[in-house]
Amino acid sequence: MTAKKTWSDRFEGSLHPTIVEFNASIGFDIELIEYDLTGSIAHAKMLAYTGIISPEEADSLVSGLEQIRQEYRTGNFNPGIDQEDVHFAVERRLTEIVGDVGKKLHTARSRNDQVGTDIRLYLRQQIDDIRQEIRNFQQALVNHAENHLETLIPGYTHLQRAQPISLAHHLLAYFQMAERDHQRLGQIRARTNISPLGCGALAGTTFPIDRHYSANLLDFEQVYNNSLDGVSDRDFAIEFMTAASLIMVHLSRLSEEMILWASQEFSFITLTDSCATGSSIMPQKKNPDVPELVRGKTGRVFGHLQALLTLMKGLPLAYNKDLQEDKEALFDGVKTVRICLQAMTVLLATGIQFKTDRLANAVAEDFSNATDVADYLASKGIPFREAYNLVGKVVKSSLAAGKLLKDLTLTEWQELHPAFEADIYDAIAPRQVVAARNSYGGTGFEEVRSALIQAKAILDHRKFWV
């Protein structure tokens, strides 16, 4: 039997069954139930504080709401599609538990400010959780960086070998990306942490409510100072999905590198059995499913951002049913970012091993030290552009002769330019090439060591909302 709608007394007929199903959001907004109960408890206490209901009535409402919370947690509260949404489902069950006093809970409140409150409480908690997961991801990066401060790896531009760098320097670049993500979410949290409770349907209420009282109970920092804006604002959700998209961009870039590094063509890392899968037909395969899935799920989060932007672009003030569509995009975006952060953290912690011998060979078998030859000449007083052009010719002739720069004899160097001396070999040795780049933020070992100390200091600061 279909439950009577809370608003149905205005109507003579009943909803068509197809429209009941089409209209219902209980299938996904049940995700908000814990936050709905928390918001309702604060609202009930505010109603008593302002004398709108008696303290005894508030106690009864709070007790009933806590009972529903316990029923939900133990699997004994499972509202069906006929309940329409989580708000009506809770109110109906509350009235069953406490009687007619349950009908007073919605005094001075609309579903519009109620759902806005729920979503903000939900997202605030999710932001806190995601920020901690970013910290876990950063810790995994730091752990590898500590172990590989002096491990060399080819640095690339245009996916062509450019200059050798410290592997730790490479990993700490992702630490910095994640740090921006962490800070960005902190800023968004502040704009999420504003209470719309008490805005009513759109115009406020005639009851003598105290919006700051309920906001304080819910740990909101502020209240909306315009009721129309309070019930219709979803900027915070769009901002979150923008930040989530950037998190996924960073995870996807790292994933792409992991996929390349695990290939036989690069062979920079080995995937452990804990984070790789096999082929159904090719027994030799070990597939990098984790980074491939992260790369694939990135587009999913981008899609949710586009969905929210498109949803909001044409909505007149204040609330419109379209806003029901914000939740599935937001919920799935949150879940996707969280599982991707968790999976990449596990991959870094237990799923990869760097092949240091292969990396050492990789930085010694190319011309990525050519810039250092030009720098060498420039340090001898030769204009850099002249030195640059000369080294280009050296590389060209060396390639034709099948030689690397390290293979040239001192005589051959001096035939190219008399400024070359025996110390050219030290200058172009991969370890020296890296060590010499000690400008601030560079890949020189001392600079990377300082960056590592700074990264560890950030992680040691456990007040992660700062």
Swiss-Prot record:
EC identifiers of the protein: 4.3.2.1
Pathway where this protein functions: Amino-acid biosynthesis; L-arginine biosynthesis; L-arginine from L-ornithine and carbamoyl phosphate: step 3/3
Major enzyme class: lyase
GO cellular component terms, semicolon-separated: cytosol
Single GO MF annotation: argininosuccinate lyase activity
Pfam families given in the database record: ASL_C2, Lyase_1
CDD domains in the record: Argininosuccinate_lyase
GO BP annotations listed: arginine biosynthetic process via ornithine; L-arginine biosynthetic process
Name of the gene: argH
Signal peptide boundaries: none
InterPro entries: Arg_succ_lyase_C, Argininosuccinate_lyase, Fumarase/histidase_N, Fumarate_lyase_CS, Fumarate_lyase_fam, Fumarate_lyase_N, L-Aspartase-like
UniProt-listed HAMAP family: Arg_succ_lyase
Cell compartment(s), UniProt: Cytoplasm
Species this chain originates from: Microcystis aeruginosa (strain NIES-843 / IAM M-2473)
NCBIfam families in the cross-refs: argH
Catalytic activity: 2-(N(omega)-L-arginino)succinate = fumarate + L-arginine
Family the UniProt entry places it in: Belongs to the lyase 1 family. Argininosuccinate lyase subfamily.
UniProt keyword list: Amino-acid biosynthesis, Arginine biosynthesis, Cytoplasm, Lyase
SUPFAM superfamilies: L-aspartase-like
Name under which the protein is recorded: Argininosuccinate lyase
